[in-house]
């Protein structure tokens, strides 16, 4: 209810997306995961619940106010020990992980943050993922706006990302009509 009743609840993933993310994490046997854009913590909670007890989620966000909503629920669900919340620009956080030699050590990433940086998040998460790892992108249909001439920078960024993913030979791709569009990219 805390997320559902939040003034910006529309930014949160849908319950069916949460169920799908949890299933994907389990299907690939993920142990180390990344989330770019935590908002009120619902997607972090669903991923953390799907992880084994020694699994870890690196949650990247810039808002203490938004993430503060979800932190008590992580505690109540018994998964707070799995979640490392880093409050800083995600590109900076991901670059820092790459600089410490973490390339190829993560299994799963979920990207749901500022759309204009999706390409940067993609490149860094792809570098951090192992072969066979999976990246899930939220909002890739963008209310259907990606099928029309771009009216905003966000729409243009998502159109560019969708085109890039479609032609990227480093991945296998599926775009699902779950929520506002959920694209799945498996690193080859």
Label each region the model flagged.
Residues 1-12:
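Rossmann-like AdoMet
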Residues 11, 15-188:
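S-adenosylmethionine/decaboxylated-SAM
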